[in-house]
Amino acid sequence: MTTKLIKHGSKAREQMLEGIDILADAVKVTLGPKGRNVLIEQSFGAPKITKDGVTVAKSIELKDKIKNAGAQLLKSAATKAAEVAGDGTTTATVLARALAREGNKLVAAGYNPMDLKRGMDLAVNAVVEEIKRSSKKINSQEEIAQVGTISSNGDKEIGEKIAKAMEEVGKEGVITVEEAKNFSFDVEVVKGMMFDRGYLSPYFVTNSEKMVAELENPFILLFEKKLSNLQPMLPILEAVVQSQRPLLIIAEDVEGEALATLVVNRLRGGLKVAAVKAPGFGDRRKAMMEDIAILTKGELITEDLGMKLENVNIKNLGTAKRVTISKENTVIVDGNGDKKNIEDRVLQIKSQIAETTSDYDKEKLQERLAKLSGGVAVLKVGGATEVEVKERKDRVEDALAATRAAVEEGVVAGGGVTLLHASQTLTKLKVENKDQQAGIEIVIEALKDPLKQIVKNAGENGGVVVGKLLEHNDKNYGFNAQDMQYVDMIKAGIIDPAKVVRTALQDAASVASLIITTETLIVDEPSDKEEPMPMRGGMGGMGGMGGMDF
């Protein structure tokens, strides 16, 4: 058993804060329109250049175990903000560091950490309510483009393309991002569908950075029942291996031995495969699988028609240009279905909508209609070099997520202004004791930090700008760090999604509260010996089965 290193009290927190400082200092330089890039060495290929806070945070691991514990906690704030709202990762990092630093000082001075936390929670809840009150719904293409532009670090073209994509497929439509084969940046609408089922095992993931399974030009097997044994499927699996193309299995469920066998062969490289549960329930599930079959020019393998798995061949499988599977969703892009058959299916669903008297059935039929006829907008990102394309693609993905957040909860004045002005509402909060009041003061001071950092990255004095803005009662009055002018942020189009600002603050406060209420830290003691290289396993398989292991 590994021996443990145990640290207590302020010494433990101070070392954790050193790790937090290291990570925050690397991330904070990316904040605002004049934020800088960060170059990250990769284990293979060219270095990665990014201005995305969460990408920088994810790349950092510290040798010192205690400092690393602090850095990992701070990283979790950035990661959570990215997962929930798609942006605000650097803001969350800056806020968490400020809250944790000030909180630790007060704990060291004898304040009760639990009361400090209660005061911070009161303040954060009040600011969240203020953000919700201040938010303004966005409707126009211009406003959508503005959000996309700001979230992509001032790239107008990205903002305009996202607005165009949303116009093509609707604000709730499916939009994906992929690398183009040329220099251009285009929006293309293709046949496609998204449904709310993710991969059945994380071992199917092909892109570990984004935790998604990406299948290029896959075959798609649609099976109505549960799969618990792969024996009947051996002929079709062998045919897929021979074709050297990936396979997506959509079934009622894939369980037990069948799932384990697929995972083993995926890991050993014999079979590029992923499995997901079919969407819907009961009769609706069968109808949705038939929709997918028509979209991909495949067949639903169903015992009602006397079809058996052992008799399935390549011709019965559907195909698509690309399938992307996340933990929650599956997106089928550019299925090879016949246009006439898809149109006939759409007309059939429309007639069912007209005939049904149930509001619930009507809603579900309309969902199916939207999935089948809406299509998928693909943002194709090009560039001169691979490094440039990847960096721009990251920004497009962030901007798309932030734009969706803006459509969902509205927008507020950007550039750190909303948090700064919201801090002024906290002076009226009533608390039970001075320690809780101190917790509120921590939040008031920390809310100034994102704006200070934006201004500092633009080469000006953040404290001076904050002082000048606080003299004004107008909550939209702020500092345009791009043009170095004081403006009405909403009129100038400098806006942030309310969800992004809210999530950044809540995630930062959550992490900071954990740090200031931590009294003991237990980590693995560093080993003097170098760890031996792991043994590499051989490639398992059975003769005549193309390296597959069944």
UniProtKB/Swiss-Prot annotation:
The source's domain of life comes to Bacteria
Give TM segment ranges.
none
Metal-binding is among the record's keywords:
no
| Recorded catalytic activity of this chain's protein | ATP + H2O + a folded polypeptide = ADP + phosphate + an unfolded polypeptide
**Cellular-component GO terms for this entry:** cytoplasm
InterPro entries on file:
Chaperonin_Cpn60_CS, Cpn60/GroEL, Cpn60/GroEL/TCP-1, GroEL-like_apical_dom_sf, GROEL-like_equatorial_sf, TCP-1-like_intermed_sf
> For this protein, what is the EC number?
5.6.1.7
EC class = isomerase
UniProt-listed Pfam families: Cpn60_TCP1 (PF00118)
Q: What biological-process GO terms show up in the record?
A: protein refolding
Question: Where found in the cell?
Answer: Cytoplasm
Positions that bind ATP: T30, L31, G32, P33, K51, D87, G88, T89, T90, T91, G415, D496
Which keywords has UniProt assigned to this entry? ATP-binding, Chaperone, Cytoplasm, Isomerase, Nucleotide-binding
Q: Which GO terms describe its molecular function?
A: ATP binding; ATP-dependent protein folding chaperone; isomerase activity; unfolded protein binding
Give the protein family.
Answer: Belongs to the chaperonin (HSP60) family.
NCBIfam families, A to Z: GroEL, PRK00013.1, PRK12849.1, PRK12850.1, PRK12851.1
Its subunit composition reads: Forms a cylinder of 14 subunits composed of two heptameric rings stacked back-to-back. Interacts with the co-chaperonin GroES.
Q: What is known about what this protein does?
A: Together with its co-chaperonin GroES, plays an essential role in assisting protein folding. The GroEL-GroES system forms a nano-cage that allows encapsulation of the non-native substrate proteins and provides a physical environment optimized to promote and accelerate protein folding.
Q: Which protein, by its recorded name, is this?
A: Chaperonin GroEL
Q: Look up and give the organism this protein is from.
A: Rickettsia prowazekii (strain Madrid E)
This protein's gene is called groEL
